[in-house]
């Protein structure tokens, strides 16, 4: 059987360890061991654990940012409801998979501060999807499909916030199950549209 390239093995191992033990406890040494390579080899491909974390988010999780970028670059394509439904679906899946990875950071204050500083230096962070959705809604506003008085940043915050909350808000319900992602995304998009869409427009 063909062996995967080292970079792929490292990303796979990092993804698995970050999901199972959390970002705070997934050391580069453990990741390298799980990938079957040395820690020095890991640093040939990734400058830091923070960079590895960002690459896991962008290459192993639902591709939320590319979706937002492509929609913002071509406003007027598809219907608003279709586009917002797909954004909500991808965002819900992204947060569902990323929340268990990042949650452990909040128990380690110094590690969290260092992590935030590194992401800031890299120009990355959890604010990017929010900014990306705001940019898309502003593009649609300029195209005449979002009401001119709509607060696009608030609308983006409502959608992304609901998608993020879905990752953990249902753990203590009787069933412990999240709402099915497709139905959740459809309802969320339709409700948001009721507040921002131009009347009688798609």
Where are these regions (language model features)?
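N-terminal intrinsically disordered/low-complexity leader segments
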Residues: 1-5, 200-202
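Helix-loop "lid/cap" segments that line or gate small-molecule binding pockets
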Residues: 73, 88-96, 103-111, 191-195
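Conserved hydrophobic residue
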Residues: 24, 146-147
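Helix-turn-helix
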Residues: 9, 17-51, 55
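Generic hydrophobic, amphipathic alpha-helix propensity
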Residues: 6-14, 31, 56-60, 64, ...
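Amphipathic alpha-helical packing segments from all-alpha helical-bundle domains
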Residues: 96-97, 101-104, 113-143, 152-157
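C-terminal peripheral helix-coil segments that are non-catalytic and often amphipathic
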Residues: 82, 86, 93, 127-143, ...
């Amino acid at each position: 059987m063909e062996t995967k390239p080292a970079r792929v093995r490292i990303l796979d191992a990092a993804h698995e360890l970050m999901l199972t033990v959390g970002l705070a406890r997934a050391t580069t040494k453990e990741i390298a061991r799980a990938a079957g390579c040395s820690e020095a080899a890991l640093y040939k491909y990734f400058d830091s654990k923070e960079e590895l974390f960002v690459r896991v988010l962008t290459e192993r999780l639902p591709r939320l940012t590319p979706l937002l970028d492509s929609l913002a670059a071509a406003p007027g394509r598809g219907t608003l409801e279709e586009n917002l439904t797909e954004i909500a679906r991808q965002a819900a899946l992204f947060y569902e998979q990323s929340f268990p990875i990042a949650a452990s950071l909040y128990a380690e204050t110094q590690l969290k501060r260092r992590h935030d500083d590194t992401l800031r230096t890299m120009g990355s962070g959890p604010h990017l999807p929010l900014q990306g959705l705001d940019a898309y809604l502003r593009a649609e506003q300029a195209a005449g499909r979002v009401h001119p008085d709509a607060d696009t940043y608030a609308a983006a915050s409502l959608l992304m916030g609901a998608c993020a909350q879905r990752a953990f808000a249902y753990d203590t319900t009787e069933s412990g199950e999240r709402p099915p992602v497709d139905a959740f995304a459809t309802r969320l998009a339709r409700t948001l549209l009721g507040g921002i869409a131009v009347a009688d427009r798609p």
